Amino acid sequence: MAHPGLPGVMFQPTVLVLAAGQGERFRAAGGHTDKLQSLLTTARGTRTVLEHVVAAVQASGLPWHVVTAQETRHHAVQGMGTSIATGVAATRHAPGWLILPADLPLVRPESLRAVAQALAQHVTVAPTVQGQRGHPVGLQALCRDELLALRGDQGARVVLQRHAPHLLALEDVGCVLDVDTPDLLAQAQRLAGPFAP
């Protein structure tokens, strides 16, 4: 389900929260639950990883859509590319998209707004944190057909190779710290501060 953004703001790309993955790396590394359902305690309370991401997206004021496994199940080939194409198809009239994997629980709302603002001036945008590329990656509607054609694990990398992204330096480790393993989840908890129960 798509959620509207702020009224009166001209350029509002839709944040696509990619939550259809299987979390295989997390389980293979010893995780006992779906990584998106793992708990993380921050100043805002104890929530699942997915709830932290959705809270940041909501706080950004941008329109958003969560791509779930249920939405992508009719595709023969699963993966990030399929999730992106499914999300773009569900929000095809958006002026652009911010692609946000749902395993980045520390991403800040202001980072989402910064990428959206830069996307108003550039066809594609990729945030960097201390030289490391991160998410969300922004793509204008000019890329719609290319995004709709993605399948499997292809992701948006092929589109970004055709449309070199504007690199936006941010100071938000939440843009680069995914929780693909239990160790990374523990690192995210340490960075979130002394809020653990």
Regions found by a protein language model. Give the residues of each.
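N-terminal glycine-rich phosphate-binding loop and ensuing alpha1 helix
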Residues: 3, 8-69
